Structures are given as structure tokens and as C-alpha cells.
Amino acid sequence: NPYRDYYIWKNPVNGKEPNNWGGAFGGSAWEYDNETQMYYLHLFSKKQPDLNWENEKVRQEVYDMMKFWCDKGIDGFRMDVISMISKDQAFPDGEVKSGLYGDFGPYCVHGPRVHEFLQEMNREVLSKYDIMTVGETSGVTIEEAQKYAGEESGELNMVFQFEHVEDASPHAEFGKWTTDRYDFKAFKKTMIKWQEELQGKAWNSLFLGNHDQPRSVSRFGNDNPAYRETSAKMLATCLHMMQGTPYVYQGEELGMTNAYFHKLEDYKDIESIQYYTELTDAGMMEPDYMMKCLMLRSRDNCLLYTSPSP
């Protein structure tokens, strides 16, 4: 298959996965292919195999696709998990911090060639069009953000950082899966830091909600009917009075709140279902507590519940 090297394939190690990396949605980051008897890498869903950006043909295909849409007159690109396109080619095991699998972060996030690839993308495509670019860059620091979106970086216009939405429970054993209350002092400190330290160096993106987050009113405000509207106005004022480009997620303009589904079968989100199964089956979390976590933190709180088709 001429497109096989467009993806990342590895042989089994001792009859198992090439390393211990866990996927972002739960389970292993590797999927076994019976036909070829090899594993392919998918940091997210197994239906989303990672592209092999080390392959120059892959990069050129991406650039050609971007040019096609730019020529159609689009206004820009939001680049999903763009900070993860470069991998450590040794593919070492990751540290097992919680759960059953190792952390791929140190070997895939802000990888060794990511800035080289983005600078090439800028030369080949972005610099030739009047468009806006924003990159999703989980785990990005102030210093890294300046590399991605600095005035002289030659890469992107701005990035999404997630420090402010991850401030709720920095010591939570299982990451986002917690019922801990949000730490507003940490939120204030983080927002001030990003406002001050990017000033004159790079441009900020401003957001409280997106397709991966619960509803902002439920998380940062009070979704009790008596306080929902006031909370929504307070959050909108906070967001829009800062320097940067604000992003309003669908429903946020209405002050929409979490769904609070009480049964597992009501959830459709792959991340929620896989983590519920993984953590409860392993005895790491009680089912009742995990359901409370889903009600507060599941992505299904903000996703379209019905089919998006006409």
C-alpha cells in the first residue's frame, strides 16, 4: 500500500504493544492489525491514526490540502492538537502516573521537530495567504507559546493554552475525573500571567468553553436557575475585557448549562465511556463516584446530543 508510511506502524514487543503509551481517550495508544501483524499509533481514537509527519510526502499532502481550501477563500485554520505532530522516534515507555498506561506527553507534545514542521508549513502555505491560524497546544508554557505564535516565530498567529481550565484540581489522582471545586485563585493567577507575559511578544486566545470542556456556567459559575444568567454575564464580561481574540463556543451566548446525565447509557462520548470502564473495572474508582465525575466533567455536557446530519 503506497499510503502505509503515511501512518506510524511498529512491530510488537514481546507479543504486546510497542510501548506502554495510553491514548487520550483511555485504553492503549496502539491498535493491532491482524492482517499485517503490526500496531499503528493513535494518540486519540483508533479511528484517528496519527499521521507520520517524518514522511515528507505526508507533509506535502497536508500543504496541498491547505492550499486547496485557501484558494477557496477560507478565513483560516484551527489546528487540532498541532503540538503533537512530532514524536520522539525512539518511542520510549512513558511514566505511569495514574491509571494503567504510560504518559506519552514527554515524547509527543512539543516534540523535537514540531517547530521545524510549522515553519515549513508557514513558508509553503500560510505566508502566501491572508488568513488567521490558531493552534491547539495542550500543555504549552509561556515560553513555548512564544515559539509557536511569537511576533517573529514564522509559525502561527495564536495558540490555545489550557492552563486556566486545568487549574481546578492540580493534585487530582485521575486528571480531569474529579468532583473537586474549581480553584478561582489559581484561575486569576493564571489569567494574569498569560496576559502580562505575552504582552508585546505574542497574541492571546481567550476562551472558557469548547468541545472538550463542560459548560462554562456550570463549571466556573452557578447554574442554579437563580444565578445562571448572572453567572453567564459575569463570565462573558471577564472574558471579553481581556486582551486577545475571544472564542465563544456554541450555546455559551445563551448561558447553556451541563446536561447532568445520570445513567452511563446516556453518554455517547468515547472518552467518558472508555475511562468509566477502564477505571471502574480496574477497581480504581467506585462507579457511583465516577458517574458524578461524568456529570461534572464529561464532554457530552457540551456536544451535540443528536446527529448533526440534516
Report the location of each language-model feature.
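Active-site and adjacent substrate-binding regions of carbohydrate-active enzymes
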Residues: N1-P310
